[in-house]
From Swiss-Prot:
It comes from Caulobacter vibrioides (strain NA1000 / CB15N). SUPFAM superfamilies: YggU-like. Gene3D superfamilies: YggU-like (3.30.1200.10). Belongs to the UPF0235 family. HAMAP family: UPF0235. This is UPF0235 protein CCNA_03737.
Length: 98
């Protein structure tokens, strides 16, 4: 991991998904790339967002404090900022974007 490097990651979150897992990359209607992620937690009192942050931190092997929800707190489509990660780390963890 590279120190001082930040990556913006767009995620479409599915709460109550049965398990915590990434399901690959997709494009929205406007052609913007996002990562599909499901978590077992319900969308109640921030539980699904917390599970998403924990899942990303564990998968990318970074501290939870390095994952920040920048936008989309109550929406399914979220923008996160990942500190100390470069795009190659994301591609290794979740596969290359389509």
């Amino acid at each position: 991991m590279a120190d001082g490097v930040a990556v913006t990651l767009v995620v479409r979150l599915t709460p109550r998904g049965g398990r915590d897992a990434a399901e690959g990359w997709a494009l929205d209607a406007d052609g913007r790339l996002y990562l599909k992620v499901r978590v077992a937690s319900p969308p109640v009192e921030g539980a699904a967002n917390a599970a998403l942050i924990a899942f990303l931190a564990k998968t990318l092997k970074i501290p939870r404090s390095a994952v920040r929800l920048a936008a989309g707190e109550t929406a399914r489509l979220k923008r996160l900022e990942l500190e100390g990660v470069d795009p190659a780390d994301v591609a290794r963890a979740f596969g290359p974007p389509n």
